[in-house]
């Protein structure tokens, strides 16, 4: 697996599991993917392996072409350090209701001034969402990805480079630490 360095004292660290971009971002896929992973294969940010156990769930929504879908996000707890961690998929952006691929499409569409194509393909996304994403991109991410020469057009590369360079998912705004696991199944 691939992880980035995170302080062992980070209690709010998220754990992100890599999924290929062609997988659907639906509650059914999230639940299916989680059912296929072995929690003992994941290591806690404190450094211990085999110590994560299901602690609970919380609800979060993602805006999709099918509407605003509710997800039950898994939280795990480390028996060694006692910290809890949310388990997300790499197609999700922490603290956002808009998927990573939709956010990248909005950023790319802004270059051609054609945001209507994104809003047409996902009617749950409106102009206000687009403005918010573009403002956050310009404020928090544009210079960062330019400085590391990270292209937007290759999703797997974008994800892995942002975790390697910044210990965050692309477009994650809050500075909560986040680690990426590859090849979890």
Predicted features by range, described:
Residues 1-92:
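Short, conserved DNA-binding cores of transcription-related domains
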Residues 1-25, 39, 83, 143-185:
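Long C-terminal interaction/binding lobes of large macromolecular proteins
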């Amino acid at each position: 697996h691939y992880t980035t360095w995170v302080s062992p004292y980070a209690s709010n660290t998220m754990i992100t599991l890599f999924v290929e971009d062609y997988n659907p971002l639906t509650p059914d896929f999230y639940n299916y993917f989680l059912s296929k992973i072995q929690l003992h294969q994941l290591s806690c940010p404190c450094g211990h392996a085999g110590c994560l156990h299901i602690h609970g769930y919380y609800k979060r929504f993602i805006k999709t072409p099918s509407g605003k879908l509710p997800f039950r996000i898994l939280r795990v707890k480390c028996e060694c350090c006692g910290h809890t961690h949310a388990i997300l998929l790499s197609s999700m952006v922490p603290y956002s209701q808009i998927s990573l691929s939709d956010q990248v499409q909005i950023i790319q569409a802004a270059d051609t001034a054609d945001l209507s194509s994104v809003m047409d393909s996902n009617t749950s996304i409106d102009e206000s969402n687009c403005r918010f994403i573009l403002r956050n991109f310009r404020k928090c991410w544009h210079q960062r990805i330019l400085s590391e020469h990270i292209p937007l057009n290759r999703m797997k590369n974008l994800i892995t480079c942002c975790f390697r360079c910044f210990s965050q998912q692309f477009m994650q705004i809050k500075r909560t630490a986040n680690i990426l696991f590859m090849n979890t199944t």
